[in-house]
Amino acid sequence: MSYTDPDDSLPEHVPGEAEMSAQKEAILKQILEPQARMRLSNIRMVKPETAAALESHLINAASQGRLAGKISDEHLKQILQSMQKPRREFKINRR
């Protein structure tokens, strides 16, 4: 009878995820001004999927060299607005 260590059954990708998360945070810290980082963390608390999409967009832009300098809070707002789906407006006319 052989004994199997319960720790062996843990997935191997957990340390990799922590490293990727740390790398992502380091990159975002380099490309975002403090106010923009604060806004991104607030968005992450409310809408994690939007924050993840925004983070990947920013990291891709930075890796392709499309960013000139750090991103300000105002620029981050513009990027967010461009990423959002257009909303329909309904007008109700009363007679």
Curated annotation (Swiss-Prot):
<keyword id="KW-0238">DNA-binding</keyword>
<dbReference type="GO" id="GO:0003677">
    <property type="term" value="F:DNA binding"/>
</dbReference>
<dbReference type="GO" id="GO:0005829">
    <property type="term" value="C:cytosol"/>
</dbReference>
<protein>
    <recommendedName>
        <fullName>DNA-binding protein CENSYa_1764</fullName>
    </recommendedName>
</protein>
<dbReference type="InterPro" id="IPR002836">
    <property type="entry name" value="PDCD5-like"/>
</dbReference>
<feature type="region of interest" description="Disordered">
    <location>
        <begin position="1"/>
        <end position="21"/>
    </location>
</feature>
<dbReference type="Pfam" id="PF01984">
    <property type="entry name" value="dsDNA_bind"/>
</dbReference>
<dbReference type="InterPro" id="IPR036883">
    <property type="entry name" value="PDCD5-like_sf"/>
</dbReference>
<comment type="similarity">
    <text>Belongs to the PDCD5 family.</text>
</comment>
